[in-house]
Amino acid sequence: ISKMIANRIFRFLKYIWQVMIIFVPIDFILGVTKVNLTSSWTIQYDFESIILSMLGFEKYNGEWWFVMPYIFLLIMTPLMFRFLQRKKADFFTDFLVVLGIALFSLYGIPKLMSYDMLIDFKGTVWGILLCNVVYLLPIYLFGMIFAKYQVFSYYHQILPKGILSYPVLLFVAAAGFYMRYKLGSSYDFFLVGPMIYACVMLIKKIPGVIWVSKKAGRYITFVWLIHSFYVFQFGQKFIYSFGNPILIFIVLAVVSFASAAAVYWLFTGLSKGVKKIRCFHNRTV
């Protein structure tokens, strides 16, 4: 593992540690034992489970299923770079490779796991991890392909100029969301890129959006990790009491961002305090 990849993994795990330091005691004090009322999976407060969750081997929060698959994808990133940087690489071939992996995830893995010799493996941590990594791999790899071949720049070149671009972008975004609704997550690798491009191009001209995005960006990973505590572990009555789905989303976003900002600045302040103590100690030694 390169130093850069190791640092990214450490930074990602540090987010998880900081959230767990705050929210595990809250869960424990409130007596939370299940992710939700219908779940058979229970939270384990023993030392081993907490440590394994902090390292990504177990999911303390059920919505954190992506932690270990993402770490594996980071570890695999140098291999993906080598594949994309091979001689005579081209977009069409790379796209076919991603499509093949996606089809294998959609049809091959379920068929493979149905064989008697793999039935027991399917439900294990490693079996679930394998399925999740293969599912996420096309999306992750296609993002790298988009970057290598500057696909967004190509979109920009073929997009109508001026005010005519907005109906096209709106159609692409709406079509993407509709296809996602109809097809589910199986073809995310193909849909996400155009959807992101269309949405970004539609809103980036709105005054203040870029500034807000930059300010909110520092909290977004915390929001990603924290929001499910309010939805699935505690706070459901408050969050869902608003009834209207749009209001529920807005309230959840506000609560999650406020919590994320509090956690961010708490640990930022602690980090600065530790640095000052170290500097003072070094001066006096």
Predicted regions: what they are:
Residues 54-69, 109-139, 173-197, 241, ...:
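Interfacial loop-to-helix transition and helix-capping segments at the boundaries
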Residues 1-7, 80-92, 148-161, 204-215, ...:
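Membrane-interface helix-boundary motifs at transmembrane edges
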Residues 19, 23, 27, 77, ...:
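Alpha-helical transmembrane segments of multipass membrane proteins
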Residues 27-31, 42-112, 127-142:
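Hydrophobic alpha-helical segments with transmembrane-like composition
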Residues 3, 12, 66, 94-95, ...:
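Residue-level signature of transmembrane alpha-helical entry/exit and packing/kink sites
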Residues 73, 77-85, 139-152, 196-205, ...:
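Hydrophobic transmembrane alpha-helices
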